[in-house]
Amino acid sequence: LVSQSFARALQERFRGQLVDSSAAASDALFKIELDQLTGVRAIARTSGVTEALTAHSWDGLDRIVRPLVVNSRLSLVHVLDSAGRPVYGIRATAEGFAENENADFASWEPVRHVLAGERDDLGDKYVGLVDAPWGLTLYTVGPVKDGNKLIGAVMVGTPLTDIANAMSSASTA
């Protein structure tokens, strides 16, 4: 009888820990998604971005975007023109930053939705897991507009390995 009671208590404690771990991991993923969405909005709405993007000015975008990337600790940021061609890109690495890495961004589903001007029930930003040349990455993509005219897109991404590490750390904390 004592061993049954003890086993039930252990089982309930284990279930509680599983629920807590699951909630913590879910919260970690929510924070990553929120940080990405905040980054997309900040970059797309910062003064000078539309002008630098229209001029295809890497230097102009770098002066504006890099401080946002550094201060917000964003892992990956790409700014694309309306055809999906990269105008600016930066990826945080252990050594610093890799710049202007290229990929077929226009073929990626969340980019296609944004550049087509599509909207769903949640708005004009899209999220997708992409098999990028630098590894599986969760991207949030939003439009860059000059008034009502779509002139490009901002992509903010987090490598899947970083997401897994954040979720694991949160669930064991």
Where do the language-model regions lie?
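Juxtamembrane extracytoplasmic/periplasmic/luminal helical "stalk" adjacent to the first N-terminal
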Residues: 1-55, 72-75, 82, 135, ...
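Amphipathic coiled-coil signal-relay and dimerization helices
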Residues: 43, 85-92, 138-139
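Extracytoplasmic/periplasmic sensor domains and loops in membrane signaling proteins
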Residues: 54-64, 70-73, 91-130, 157, ...
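Hydrophobic beta-strand positions
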Residues: 79, 143-144
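A cross-kingdom signal targeting lumenal/periplasmic-facing segments of multi-pass membrane
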Residues: 80-81, 131
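A short beta-strand signature within small-molecule sensing/ligand-binding domains used
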Residues: 125-126, 134-143
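Short hydrophobic/glycine-rich mini-motifs in sensory/regulatory modules
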Residues: 144-154
